[in-house]
Amino acid sequence: MKTLNRVSVIGAGAWGTALAGVAARAGREVTLYARDAATAAAISATRDNPRLPGIPLDRSIVVTHDLAAAGRADIIVIAVPAQNSRTAVAALAPHLAAGTPVIASAKGIEHGTRRFMTEVIEEAAPQTVPAILSGPSFADDVARGLPTAVTLAAKDEAMAVALVHALGSAAFRPYHTTDLRGVEIGGAAKNVLAIAAGIVVGKQLGASAQAALTTRGFSELVRLGLACGARSETLSGLSGLGDLILTCSSPQSRNFSLGIALGRGESAPRGKLSEGAFTAPALLELAAANGVEMPVANAVAAILAGRLTIDAAIDNLLTRPFRAEG
């Protein structure tokens, strides 16, 4: 396998900028691609990204608006929202050499197709090798170099190991797996479930209810994952349970914050993307296709679509028939 030294991150938002810093700290030659030329020029000149205030960009990172230049890399990291990933990968595809690993870092399922992000990469750039990076990680923590552990998956174990060694450091510790589906289901489902956890907090239903909701939500995540062929150890690992715990308990999570606002009867926080809101309908379609019941995720989707009030959703969940745990 060739040396994986040049890393390009596509997307100069908070997460993309944080991941560019990860690659730089790992000793790689890093390019950060911004779609907007003015944004690229400003970040390059000031070494500051307004999306990550107070965290200077490493001087070694090259910021560009040139997609062809960004494509000349040994590793590509796609750091755009899930629903924009296909467009980003398709635009980049003509500039990518055969066999280039392309790592998805968005947590979601594509609308309309029910495709996971590695499937989107496989379709939009079939000459490349899809991979996925996911786990309990906030952009601000990662950008500051605070200790973080994540999961990195690729179909080929040797490739997964090579990517881990290319991006890992003392502060950013990826664990490798070949279980793409498990990693992707964990990341997608936890965003939807975090909205429910936020609603519990916003409605002031108590810490006991929050713990119960998170645990029952995890049961839904596991049922769906196993039905889709995921491994149980992946679902109970960093990209599943680990990410769920973080996202269901921290106001840094946009999905959790959205739920808190909804629970308080407020409008959604402005200017903050909640992947869970976009993923909820696709997640339920996937669950239905696999014969999996997900009452908590279903309640979230119904609330977001305006089909059910929060109070009615809570009543529905609390009056479900008693059953054995599992």
UniProtKB/Swiss-Prot annotation:
Keyword entries, A-Z: Cytoplasm, Lipid biosynthesis, Lipid metabolism, NAD, NADP, Nucleotide-binding, Oxidoreductase, Phospholipid biosynthesis, Phospholipid metabolism
Record-level GO BP terms: carbohydrate metabolic process; glycerol-3-phosphate biosynthetic process; glycerol-3-phosphate catabolic process; glycerophospholipid metabolic process; phospholipid biosynthetic process
Keyword flag Nucleotide-binding: yes
Record flagged with keyword Lipid biosynthesis: yes
Residues where sn-glycerol 3-phosphate binds: K107, G135, S137, K190, D243, S253, R254, N255
EC number: 1.1.1.94
Compartments in which it is found: Cytoplasm
GO cellular component, one term: cytosol
UniProt cross-references to PROSITE patterns, sorted A to Z: NAD_G3PDH
Active site, per annotation: K190 (proton acceptor)
Annotated coiled-coil segments of the chain: none
Catalytic activity, as annotated: sn-glycerol 3-phosphate + NAD(+) = dihydroxyacetone phosphate + NADH + H(+); sn-glycerol 3-phosphate + NADP(+) = dihydroxyacetone phosphate + NADPH + H(+)
Pathway annotation from the record: Membrane lipid metabolism; glycerophospholipid metabolism
Residues reported in the UniProt entry to bind NADPH: W15, R35, K107, A139, R254, L273, E275
Any one GO MF annotation of this record: NAD binding
Similarity-based family: Belongs to the NAD-dependent glycerol-3-phosphate dehydrogenase family.
Function, in words: Catalyzes the reduction of the glycolytic intermediate dihydroxyacetone phosphate (DHAP) to sn-glycerol 3-phosphate (G3P), the key precursor for phospholipid synthesis.
Protein name: Glycerol-3-phosphate dehydrogenase [NAD(P)+]
